[in-house]
Amino acid sequence: IADYDKHPAGQNVTIAVMSYEGYNMQDSIIFNKGSIDRGLARSTYFRTYTVEELRYSGGLVDEICIPDKEVKGYRSEKDYKYLEDDGIVYTGATVKIDDVIIGKTSPPRFLGELEEFSIAADMRRESSAVIKQGEEGKIDMTILTESEEGNKLVQVKTRDHRIPEI
């Protein structure tokens, strides 16, 4: 999407390596705090989360939606707070660790679970896409499309501005 091979992203910074007040020049690089405050070395990190509604044998399918409380593995309501009625997060939402961005429920992993306990076929488990550990940001873009097999495919792109630590 960004064509980094044609339009590279980055900054060219000229530095002078010399001793500073008698300290060894291999210890560190000293930056002016004002240059960091004005945007030097800032970057934007993008991550794309992809969820597909898969079809399984026996006519069972995944479903992109807000999971019900009866679903096995249901999280707390606050984890689903950014989802709209279609089970997908809205563009511009500020998300953090463990927030659900694409709600999804799946049939039981093994058909033996249904037969063994004589449970109805509507028993489902939670398999939503959540923000990974150590990440946060804003929802930049949402794409709804179909996979090559004709399954519904949802992609959510997050954007995080990263500032160097001083």
Give the residues covered by each predicted segment.
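Intrinsically disordered, low-complexity regulatory segments
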Residues: 1-166
